Structure formats: structure tokens, C-alpha cells
């Protein structure tokens, strides 16, 4: 097994492991018959991210990207369907889901019908997916600032931080090995935000085991 194959396996293992953290929320919803205290938007944005990268993987013919995002999109769809079943705010949830579907339709028309197949199509899709992934990695920064203000790490999940670090590192190295900056660059912020979390755990006290807060998505 060469280094690229090793990185591919690492990307699959760590990323799928991260996606399965949503199973905790799934079990919680089934046990309580309620979607209270479970965030819906992360499921939706991660699904959108997965589908975007799945399309990118199909255009590029990258089996690792395709496999990971098929699993990711499937799991997010299960989480979304479960949330829709148990939530009391069905109108809001259906509206947000419909908005996501609309965005997907517009994106598909643009990337499939407006842009001619080729390098420009792949580059624009890669750039779009990269920007979306970076925004997802940077979105928890407001929470980190709040943690620094309150000096409490109770809202952080150490296991999810570890998973994010290894997942981001694997994809960064994988993209670097392929020379694909659309894969490498958007995963770099995940490394830095994970290091910030590790520092906060060290600075503000011992690691507090808790149920992972399902927030992030990876390609």
C-alpha cells in the first residue's frame, strides 16, 4: 500500500466516523420522541456539502471523494428525515429543506447545463465547494469566542475535536498528494480550529466527556 492509498483509507475511516456522530442525536430523538435540543441546520448544510463534493468527485473520477460523500449524504438524509418526523416546528424545517433543494436545483442547472464540461466546470465547482466547506469550518468561531469569555469548555466535545483534527489533516495531506488545492485548502482551517479547541481544553481545565455536538461536515 503506497502513501496515497494509506491517506485514502484514513480519509474514509475518519470522515465516516465523524458523520456517524449524528447517530447520537438520532438515538436521542427516537428515545425522547422529540427533536428538542437537537440542531437541524448542521444536518442540512452537511448534506448540501456532501452532495456538492459528490458531484465534484464524479466529475473528477475520485473514488475516495465519491465513496465518502455517498455515505455522508445518505446519513444526513436519514438524520433530516428523522428530525422532520419528530420536530414540532415542521413548517420551519420543511421551508429550510425546500430552500436547500432549490439551491441544489439551481446549482445543478448552472454546473451541468450553463457551463461547458471540462476544466472550467471542474474548477468552478471545486471553488464553490471549497468556499462552502471553509465557511462551515469557521462557523463555530463565534462559539469559541463565547467559550473564551465564559472560560468554560462544557459546550465542547473533545472526541469530536479529535475526529475533526484527524479528518482535516487526512484530507489536507490527500489533497496535497494529489496536487488538488480544492481539496487541500478548505480542510486546512479545520486543523487550526481543532488546535484552538485543544488549547482551550488545556487552558480552561480537564476534558469533560459529553455527547458530541454535531456541527461539522467534511468533504
Curated annotation (Swiss-Prot):
Entry annotated with the keyword Transit peptide: no
Residues of the MtN3/slv domain: 5-90, 124-204
Gene3D superfamilies (UniProt xref): 1.20.1280.290
Localisation: Golgi apparatus membrane; Cell membrane
Gene Ontology CC annotations of this record: Golgi membrane; membrane; plasma membrane
Any Pfam family the entry gives: MtN3_slv
BP GO terms, sorted: carbohydrate transport
Superkingdom classification of source: Eukaryota
Gene Ontology molecular-function annotations: sugar transmembrane transporter activity
The UniProt record lists the keyword Ion transport: no
UniProt KW keywords: Cell membrane, Golgi apparatus, Membrane, Repeat, Sugar transport, Transmembrane, Transmembrane helix, Transport
Protein's membrane topology: Multi-pass membrane protein
Alphabetized InterPro entries for the sequence: SWEET, SWEET_rpt
Membrane-spanning ranges: 3-23, 38-58, 63-83, 98-118, 125-145, 156-176, 189-209
Family: Belongs to the SWEET sugar transporter family.
Function text: Mediates sugar transport across membranes.
Name of the protein in its database record: Sugar transporter SWEET1
Organism this protein belongs to: Danio rerio
Amino acid at each position: 500500500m503506497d502513501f496515497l492509498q494509506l491517506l485514502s483509507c484514513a480519509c474514509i475511516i475518519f470522515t465516516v466516523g465523524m458523520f456517524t456522530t449524528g447517530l447520537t442525536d438520532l438515538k436521542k430523538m427516537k428515545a425522547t420522541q422529540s427533536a428538542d435540543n437537537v440542531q437541524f441546520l448542521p444536518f442540512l448544510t452537511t448534506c448540501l456539502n456532501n452532495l456538492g463534493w459528490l458531484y465534484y468527485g464524479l466529475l473528477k473520477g475520485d473514488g475516495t471523494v465519491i465513496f465518502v460523500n455517498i455515505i455522508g449524504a445518505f446519513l444526513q438524509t436519514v438524520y433530516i428525515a428523522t428530525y422532520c418526523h419528530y420536530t414540532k416546528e415542521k413548517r420551519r424545517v420543511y421551508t429550510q429543506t425546500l430552500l436547500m433543494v432549490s439551491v441544489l436545483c439551481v446549482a445543478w442547472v448552472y454546473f451541468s447545463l450553463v457551463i461547458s464540461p471540462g476544466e472550467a466546470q471542474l474548477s468552478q465547482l471545486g471553488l464553490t465547494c471549497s468556499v462552502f466547506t471553509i465557511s462551515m469550518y469557521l462557523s463555530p468561531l463565534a462559539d469559541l469566542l463565547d467559550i473564551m469569555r465564559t472560560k468554560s469548555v462544557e459546550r465542547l466535545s473533545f472526541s469530536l475535536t479529535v475526529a475533526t483534527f484527524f479528518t482535516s489533516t487526512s484530507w489536507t495531506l490527500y489533497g496535497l498528494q494529489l496536487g488538488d488545492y480544492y481539496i487541500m485548502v478548505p480542510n486546512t482551517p479545520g486543523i487550526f480550529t481543532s488546535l484552538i479547541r485543544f488549547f482551550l481544553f488545556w487552558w480552561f481545565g480537564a476534558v469533560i466527556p459529553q455527547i458530541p455536538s454535531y456541527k461539522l461536515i467534511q468533504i
